[in-house]
Amino acid sequence: MGAWGQGGLASPTMTAPLARPTTSLSGGVGVAAHSPATAAAGMALLDAGGTAADAAVGMTLAACAVEPFVVSLLSGLHGIHVDVDGTTRAVDGFVDVPAVPTGGRRAETTIDFGGARMPYSIGGATFGTPGLVAGCWHLHRRFGRLPWAEVVAPAIEWAGTGFVLSDRDESLLHMLEPVMTLGVGREVFCIDDRMRVEGELVRIPDLADALRQIAEEGGPTLYEGAMSRELATFAQEVGALVTAEDLGACTAVEHTPPTVRLGGWQVRSRRGLSPLTDWVARLDASDGPHAARLALAQSPTPPKALGTTSLAATDTDGRACAVTASLGLGTGDWFRGSQLNSMLGEVDLLVGGLRPRTRMGSMMAPTAVVSPTGQATVLGAAGGSRIPSALLRTIDGIVLGELDATAAVDLPRIHRVGELVHVEPHLEDRDEAALVAAGFTVQRWTSRHHFFGGVSVAGAAGTQGDPRRGGVGLAHR
């Protein structure tokens, strides 16, 4: 019996006992996500009596249907959950290195980031063992209340009806054209020999059926069930290295995240490749002009990473849950409506090389901030190497600036790359002068931009998606 059969993990309806409320979420009950459709899925589950984890899991699965440029069922995730008694747990459902990590079929491509062209590896050999469904299953089993099939239902509905491309979607699609138009992607994202544009309907074949199977058989079907055998066969056909044994060995890992202090608050977040907790500690210990402190708290970060979404939810009992999920660029191969992740081709994540059957590193860092009075807010960010700086700025606004979620997300972002600091418009002149005085070269952007990442916030500070990434927040007041 594999790891999925241990400790009752094979039961799709098993959930953990729910604790009694002691935390406060004065900002209201709601969700935040990068897509209105994703947010709607989470809100429907809250309306049905679901927990924050139910909503977060449902949104993650729905995002696989309506945000296919950045996430799929064959991706990885990181999550954080704050229970009603304040207990905070992190869940790692990211991507594993397969047992045989080298060989296979690989291709090289280039992505144009608005004038900066960067090389990427794609193809089957870049596919890592996907932990997203394992992470969703674990979050639901530990912290959910609704039946599993009900949590998956909104994703099935969106996969069946399709979604209308937004202007942000069109921009992403055109940027990712070299991989999104391969294989099944050409059928999905092109029409009459051209790429689809804003306002046109996109529906991914076979995804609804795959989601129905996961709803009926539970998350383990992707790892030790019928679907796992299909996926292992498909992986071999496309030159991937993931085997049935690799899938069976992939499980979510739960742990207590480290805590650092900031202005009397507790900031709880994972480490791994994320430097966020170190940056928060530096910010708390430093003095001087605020903008310079924000930049000095940061350290040089990897230059590239693609394909991420973030979401957050709070429920009526005071629980909060945030998830960040990532596809990477994608391999260009599609299995039953889901593109394979390309994490083995993300060189920035391969710290220490490809070690067989190990969990890959990630910059993703869903985070909880808890006030001195016990009020909790969760947040996560998308944006590759800009994830920590986007979170740091938003946490700074909530904790030190005493701002609500909307105002904190709206703050001009500051992102350091070596001695160069990228800043968004509307940063005050005195703050820019402080950066220059601290020895930084300042590059001021002319408009608020998705380059600076997208933050989703829910909890005591309020509910807010990030307009830089087309995000929305929905709340019951």
Where are the regions that the model predicts?
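Short beta-strand scaffold segments in enzyme catalytic cores
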Residues: 71-83, 258, 309-314, 320-322, ...
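Noncatalytic scaffold domains of N-terminal-nucleophile
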Residues: 2-44, 50-217, 222-224, 229-267, ...
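Short, small/polar residue-rich loop motifs at catalytic or cofactor-binding pockets
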Residues: 254, 305-308, 362-364
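Internal maturation/activation junctions in enzymes
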Residues: 265, 271-326, 336, 445
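Short Gly/Pro-enriched turn/cap motifs at secondary-structure boundaries
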Residues: 69, 125-126, 301-304, 355-361, ...
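Active-site rim segments in enzyme catalytic domains, especially the processed small/beta chain
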Residues: 65-69, 76-82, 87-90, 243, ...
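N-terminal accessory/precursor segments of enzymes
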Residues: 90-142, 266-287, 360-415
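C-terminal catalytic domains of large/alpha subunits in multi-subunit enzymes
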Residues: 249-253, 290-305, 315-316, 369-373, ...
